[in-house]
Amino acid sequence: MKFFLGSALFLILTFINLVRAEFEFITPAEDSRWARGFTYAVKWKQPTEQFVEIALQYADSNNTLITSSGVIPSNQTYWMVKIDKKWLMKMDNITARVVAVPQNGTASTVYVGPQVLLANTFYWKMVVDVSPAFSVNPIDKKLAIGLSVGLSCCILIVLFLHFATRRERRILKNEKELEMSSYRKH
């Protein structure tokens, strides 16, 4: 008896999950921000029904309809919606919900999708990790100045020695030329 109840419960929960997973939204993400005047796409995985209707409704207790897509054939898995100013009802922000109603000829089930925030303006939401102000260690600053001055002086000394001893560093082709040149001078 215990085994039968456990397997029956498993089958019921599996059926509930299958019914809930029948219609799955891909976009928008939960709590997305949709700005007035912009066009957004509502995408979903292809359902088993022939036709589907997607709607945007206010997330209040009345579930007032904002706009609807009309009947969409099953081979189309997106709906483009442009946010209108009158949907905001003279407010700055308002929460809406995307819903789907598969049209299968019988009593249709309403599948509730993600909530979106309809907004009057568009902005990027940036999350900035605030770290403490960057402080320069005075020893590091002195070390950087000292190293750069010291290396510059070394380079200048090497260049000076290179150009100052240029005549003494000549390489002669062979030793006889050296002897001949010193013999003629005497």
Swiss-Prot record:
TM region(s), chain numbering: 143-163
Gene Ontology BP annotations: endoplasmic reticulum to Golgi vesicle-mediated transport
N-terminal signal peptide: 1-21
Membrane topology: Single-pass type I membrane protein
Glycosylation sites: N62, N75, N93, N104
CC annotations in GO: Golgi apparatus; membrane
Extracellular side: 22-142
Cytoplasmic side: 164-186
Compartment list: Membrane
Cystine crosslinks: none
InterPro entries per record: Pma1
Keyword Oxidoreductase attached: no
Keyword terms, alphabetized: Glycoprotein, Membrane, Signal, Transmembrane, Transmembrane helix
Protein name (database record): Uncharacterized protein C21C3.17c
